[in-house]
Amino acid sequence: MLKITKFGGSSVANATQFKKVKAIVQADPSRKYVVVSAPGKRNSSDNKITDLLYLLDAHRQYHVDASNVYRLIRQRFVDIKTELGLKQPIEKELDTFYTNLNTYTQAQIVSRGEYFCAKLMAEYLGYDFV
């Protein structure tokens, strides 16, 4: 039997959590498909990536400089990539996303948290990104 496994935001909040996910997935060979949320809070004073993406969209909508919000989002994904030693060119994809921010709807912007997290998780697990 094949299993689909879903991990929420706190389960993918940082590289340490990614390692726990990998251990869980590898413990059961029937876990062939993994679905991830956007990274959640790393601690009580932290921000969820989804919340930051909503804030990024609000800045875009009201023509306010969003670069500081973007840097927080970008850094979180880069930190995960770096700590896990991944090769995924996530920086380039993130920068392209930010450059083209005005071409996206709110739903597209907010969905990038799951998208970028899934890209990193797929590489980390050695799975195909679908």
Give the ranges of each region predicted by the language model.
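Nucleotide/pyrophosphate-binding catalytic subdomain
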Residues: 1-130
